[in-house]
Amino acid sequence: MTDRYAATAGAYDLMNAPWRAVQVVALEHLLPLLQPDAGPILDVGAGSGVNIEWLLERSPDAQVYALEPSPAMRALALSRIAAHLEWQHRVTVRPEDFFAATLPERLGGAILLGVLGHFDPGERAAVLAELADRLPHGGAALIDLQPPERPEAVPAATISRTQVGELEYRLIAEATPIDDERLHWRMTYLSLEGERVLTEDTAEHIYHHPGPDALLAEAASVWLHAERLGETTYWLLRRA
């Protein structure tokens, strides 16, 4: 199976750096709402394991149940865990996606950052229903919606660049609309010495952009209260 995130994994945390501060603020809002005594914290699309690390460092009672189907991204997460032997009994990193994995019956909370757009409307409804069924009353999940809020053409532009020693790592993104919810994204990852390109990898994704109003309505239909935290982040609270 082709790993669509193999290109991304090469410098994932470097490329994600411009958005990490926003994610951390959202995680800090989520932390007091987690109920680790009710079940593990579900991390869907765990990526490099950066949110696993954040949780395990700040919630000593938490167990994490992570899903990451990309072999390249999963290798990053497992390498992060391997550096902390004390975490190995507190975290499971499964290679399946949301619908292939056996989910815990009860969850103490959930994190879905950068993943909701991978689900079409029917799949998105099923994900929200599964969360509502497994979260305790008052339990919370953290999600985000990737910009733009509605599909529109995005001209090619550098959206992230980081200098590490003598080399620069650069991410160029562009997108074209497919319909009223989907965008076709093209992401180009470069490593450069000056302006000389050393490596160039490209990944293409079809991503769903449901918009805030649609998200709030879909969440409410399964008794999840969606509340906006920042420009792109939301938490979902399980109503009694």
Regions found by a protein language model. Give the residues of each.
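Conserved beta-strand signature within the Rossmann-like core of class I S-adenosyl-L-methionine
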Residues: 138-145
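Class I SAM-dependent methyltransferase SAM/SAH-binding core
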Residues: 49-100
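Conserved class I S-adenosyl-L-methionine
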Residues: 1-47
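A short acidic, Gly/Pro-enriched loop at the edge of an enzyme's catalytic core
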Residues: 102-110
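A short glycine-rich, Lys/Arg-flanked "PGG" loop and its adjoining helix->strand segment in the class I
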Residues: 125-137
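SAM-dependent methyltransferase
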Residues: 145-210
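C-terminal lobe and adjacent flexible extensions of AdoMet/dcAdoMet transferase-like proteins
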Residues: 208-240
